[in-house]
């Protein structure tokens, strides 16, 4: 007799994966094993730190396994001991070998934070904001040997608001993914959901954000710069140079007024923010900053301290 729910092995590592694992546990999907990345040294003290998924799984009483690489033959042997129906992959952080994908009857079900086939790759949330998309979403899909190219089981859209940052949208999509994952798993297990192949001709890609992309080019349009800042807030953070130091920029707002300043020129330094000229002649209001070695703060607070020298006529950029 077929059981009501499929037994799964869960692969995940960062905060994004926790809502999905929590949903599986709360909805009574049997999680046989949690596979996550090894503990790593972090911070100035280089203390050994467990991945967020391991911390949650341990509190939930789930068994954890932390292989250095999935290509080790011992991994296949270990996972083969569990009579699981499928693998569930949520931001594990390493490619899943074909041998593992094929080891269970249902294969590997993946949660991807974009509307595939758009934004395949490592940074779909960042790229969607950066390019000025008005919507994004979550796709539940089957893994194949390609990069996010497998058939789709389920998909849900969400609007990208003008003040959404990477951090805000990350949390929204993590929760949305968890909510549609469980139903997709159950329906696919029961044979009530047919995978739909992606249209590969419509595929776009979302490579990881490089350090050079984080440097603000003030000759670009106000909208482009605003989107960049939101797309990498809180980390790694968009930055410029001021007084020979790195100055990270947060909480931007496009001001629909034409300014006469040069790109990167401070036009106004007021309690409600720094107004900077951009390449299209439109102002960008900056409400939060973080000088190298300091904490993030409102511009009004910064202006009372080291930011006193950041006055109209100052040119941001360069080194």
PLM region spans:
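An anion-binding loop in the catalytic cleft
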Residues: 219-319
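N-terminal glycine-/serine-/threonine-rich beta1-alpha1-beta2 phosphate-ribose binding loop
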Residues: 37, 41-83
